[in-house]
């Protein structure tokens, strides 16, 4: 499904740097994997902790309208699964530190774009940055595919080895990878480029609005890298990953 994207202009401020957030400057070698020339991908999907830091900065700068656009919708958990299963998640997934390293979900494409703009401004204003000018952004579908090109490990959901006998018997379901919902980032083995969760965990938003990689709720066949997922945002099965493009070294 191709989503129509709307952009909001944000006033973004420089604060310290961390994870891909505030306590340290980004370590490109540690945090990113080179995809092509001056293009790098984050090793993991954006987490609750990272996204919450972005939201906090909007509040600190009194960017009320932008915060309203970018805030997550926790009630989407209740719409996807039964109340008994999801009420704890709806109440705590985005705020409890237990889930800090879980992927952010239940946001819109505007929220993903806003986060990228914020991260770009922080980096480019940090005097300790490695590169003179970069842009953090969502990947195009083609760039996302480059992230998994020649990936021999990419046939497993969440890069987790699902027993083939279960698949051949036709009884594979979305809990066979070891997770009933989302799982913490980097929980499973990375692909052969060192990128985590390219298949499964959460489907990832691309620049064109297509969703790639499948989610915790998809069967293995639905997570094929060639396929697109068809969800309306916000959704508890959808998050995003940032790419970094070096504009000036």
Where are the model-predicted features located?
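Flexible, glycine-rich phosphate/dinucleotide-binding loops
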Residues: 61, 122, 249
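Intrinsically disordered, low-complexity segments enriched in glycine/proline and serine/threonine
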Residues: 5-7, 207, 248
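Short beta-strand-to-coil "C-cap" segments at the C-terminal boundary of structured domains/repeats
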Residues: 242-249
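Functional-site microenvironments in short loops/helix caps that host divalent-cation chemistry
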Residues: 24-28, 92-236, 246
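A short glycine-rich, aromatic-capped structural motif
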Residues: 25-91, 103-111, 200
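Bacterial Sec-dependent N-terminal signal peptides
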Residues: 1-30, 147
């Amino acid at each position: 499904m191709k989503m129509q994207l709307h952009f909001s202009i944000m006033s973004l401020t420089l604060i310290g740097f961390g994870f891909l957030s505030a306590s340290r400057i980004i370590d490109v070698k540690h945090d990113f994997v080179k995809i092509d020339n001056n293009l790098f991908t984050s090793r993991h999907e954006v987490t609750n902790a990272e996204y919450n830091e972005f939201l906090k900065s909007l509040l600190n700068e009194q960017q009320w309208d932008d915060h309203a656009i970018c805030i997550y919708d926790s009630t989407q958990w209740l719409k996807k699964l039964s109340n008994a299963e999801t009420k704890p998640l709806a109440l705590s997934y985005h705020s409890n530190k237990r889930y800090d390293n879980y992927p952010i979900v239940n946001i819109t494409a505007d929220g993903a774009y806003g986060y990228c703009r914020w991260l770009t401004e922080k980096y480019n204003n940090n005097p300790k940055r490695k590169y003179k000018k970069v842009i953090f952004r969502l990947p195009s579908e083609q760039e996302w595919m480059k992230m998994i090109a020649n990936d021999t490990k990419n046939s497993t959901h969440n890069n987790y080895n699902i027993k083939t006998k279960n698949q051949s018997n036709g009884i594979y379901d979305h809990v066979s990878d070891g997770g009933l919902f989302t799982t913490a980032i980097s929980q499973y083995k990375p692909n052969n480029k060192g990128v985590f969760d390219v298949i499964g965990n959460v489907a990832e938003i691309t620049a064109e609005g297509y969703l790639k990689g499948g989610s915790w709720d998809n069967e293995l066949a639905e997570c094929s890298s060639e396929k697109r997922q068809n969800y309306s945002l916000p959704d508890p099965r959808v998050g995003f990953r940032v790419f970094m493009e070096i504009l000036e070294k």
